[in-house]
Amino acid sequence: MVDWLSLLPWNKIFTAACGCFLSDSNYIHLMESNLDALQKTMEELKNGRDDLLARVSIEEDKGLQRLALVNGWLSRVQIVESEFKDLLEAMSIETGRLCLFGYCSEDCISSYNYGGKVMKNLEEVKELLSKKNFEVVAQKIIPKAEKKHIQTTVGLDTMVGIAWESLIDDEIRTLGLYGMGGIGKTTLLESLNNKFVELESEFDVVIWVVVSKDFQLEGIQDQILGRLRPDKEWERETESKKASLINNNLKRKKFVLLLDDLWSEVDLIKIGVPPPSRENGSKIVFTTRSKEVCKHMKADKQIKVDCLSPDEAWELFRLTVGDIILRSHQDIPALARIVAAKCHGLPLALNVIGKAMVCKETVQEWRHAINVLNSPGHKFPGMEERILPILKFSYDSLKNGEIKLCFLYCSLFPEDFEIEKDKLIEYWICEGYINPNRYEDGGTNQGYDIIGLLVRAHLLIECELTDKVKMHDVIREMALWINSDFGNQQETICVKSGAHVRLIPNDISWEIVRQMSLISTQVEKIACSPNCPNLSTLLLPYNKLVDISVGFFLFMPKLVVLDLSTNWSLIELPEEISNLGSLQYLNLSLTGIKSLPVGLKKLRKLIYLNLEFTNVLESLVGIATTLPNLQVLKLFYSLFCVDDIIMEELQRLKHLKILTATIEDAMILERVQGVDRLASSIRGLCLRNMSAPRVILNSVALGGLQQLGIVSCNISEIEIDWLSKERRDHRSTSSPGFKQLASITVIGLVGPRDLSWLLFAQNLKDIQVQYSPTIEEIINKQKGMSITKVHRDIVVPFGKLESLHLYQLAELTEICWNYQTLPNLRESYVNYCPKLLEDIANFPKLKG
């Protein structure tokens, strides 16, 4: 007979029975009170969940994506709520078993276990309640693909169709597009990119990367991460860490990687790109001039991009020249067909030559063009010999020698390099190419006029969303060819831009070279002492320079332009810089320079000195006597600030035309604005570490201001004084405002609740506001309406604004009451502005 008593779990029974009286948890005794608390807290949790879901729904309607953190919290709530429902179903049975005033139970084991579950569920509900307040619930979705702006194309549709069919073929994972320079490979790739936008394909992300001839792995990584991680928190990471970030991101995605302009094999594994496969469904498409590169990249399919057919070439040429010119004489169409035929179906040549012929209205001009294009060609390494002489016709069509020199100067920059327009014009002025009056406004205007002319001639390309230009690589090759006397004097122009050299190359013909460009070459040390009797231009920015030898500047008597900017590790210059007696342009911005060498005082011809963002520069005392001929002095965000002593120095610079400055004292700011000649020369102003109840900016005195920075300031109120001294007694209602102010950056400003004074800068193109905890509105409605009522020329706030960045503004709730604001916005970045999310919906062009 079975001994049933021996089979009972006496140890558990004993433990449970003791637990009725001895357990610290008091699961049984506190069961009823815990159940009451659980039901109340669960109701509160469900209300919190519903409120959160409502917020999430609003943000998702705006096109934002809920945060993974929010999703995780909601999932946990769902699990806890399910457990709670199970506990409710058993509640009546378990509470009915309680006896001895709730201190014991008829079934101690069951009640003990149930009470433990109630306690656990209650603790989880309380924990979730403590985490229910999310400042931000959703974020901007990275678009699958970003549309490229493409000019009208002819004869490309068939090629796009062929390439697209190849792309959607499961067997083809890597596609190579090859053909000569200027054939339209980039346009073809841009067209494929735009098809991903139009068709909303199943790919998670389409990434565009410009590779170029002298590519750097880290540069490619930065472009990829810039697309995947707009937060930019990866910028200071190492190459290997960036590779890891890219790999971790892309291995979870079905991606398309578009690589433009490969000149050699690129190690995608080293970059961090996982290989495309049938399993992940990803694709890689690249363009190159070389079929060999297609083989090295292991392309599953290669497509040759050919020149246009004669009919297609004529159609593109006709569209470029325009029917008005072609109809101006009955013989011109036939002559135009001959000119078009000389372009050999190359789209770049057809566009460039077509633009050069836009104003040719006589038969004689067209016949002359044919004669020029029939002239004997030359041989060019790496380029079909029939193309560059044809493109040269557009160069020959430029109005005068100065414009031609300006164009050729652009070839000194790396391939695909985006050149700042203002910086380019500054080079041109110091080189003596434009405007004998140097830095008067006319010089800058003339520079912009030349840039516009070169853009319209298709010799320069306008960059999107920036005040920059760049060169097509074939046009750049032509410019380098012309600049070296058609290849006969290649040693006179030394351009190593973009190459990895680390040390100054040994193959430079120092005694012959006229212009040298080592931009972004990773040069770390200059140890040579060359004899350079003809060198006039030396460009060394964007490098890793640490040391320049004592003898390097000893024998450069004709050097006019020296650019050492963006070499953060460069902390001193050799005293022998004093030997550069012809130097007119010296750029030391974004360097670690601590003090200027004594020898600088011998540079009597120096007219341009840039010391912006020199964060350790200690002194400028004596600059008026040292460099009396300065016309441009740039000190924006330099450690060195303007004080009373420097004010006196600056006033003694009789030729000063342009000044950018950093000011920390409100009284100094007031005094500077009171000196007309000084104030009128200010183009950039940085207010830093300034503490004052009120700061006044006079828009008349600072009429030339183009860039304003307010950094780490504690200012209760910023006020605009728009009256000049002469008009102060005749209160006119006409507001001149800051007519030239294009860019404003506000970082770490404490005090004001709004920035309504920005209405006085109606030509703003770029606004950045970050880490400013007291700002609640960009434009306050009451203040804004008051300003526009008095100054009726202020119609639409920020009517010309193209870029708006708002970051870490905890109290910001509104941008502007006028929803017509931001009509021309092209780029926006809004992050960590939790109270602004509802207002974003009022501005269709603004993306959170």
From Swiss-Prot:
Keywords (A to Z) from UniProt: ATP-binding, Coiled coil, Leucine-rich repeat, Nucleotide-binding, Plant defense, Repeat
GO MF term list: ADP binding; ATP binding
Coiled-coil boundaries: 25-62
LRR repeats: 534-555, 558-580, 582-604, 605-627, 629-649
Annotated positions binding ATP: 179-186
NB-ARC domain segment(s): 137-439
GO BP terms, alphabetized: defense response
Keyword Protease assigned: no
Domain of life: Eukaryota
InterPro entries: Apaf_helical (IPR042197), LRR_dom_sf (IPR032675), LRR_R13L4/SHOC2-like (IPR055414), NB-ARC (IPR002182), P-loop_NTPase (IPR027417), Plant_NBS-LRR (IPR050905), WH-like_DNA-bd_sf (IPR036388)
Record's comment describing the protein's domains: The LRR repeats probably act as specificity determinant of pathogen recognition.
Stated role: Probable disease resistance protein.
Family: Belongs to the disease resistance NB-LRR family.
Protein's name according to its UniProt entry: Probable disease resistance protein At5g43730
Organism: Arabidopsis thaliana (Mouse-ear cress)
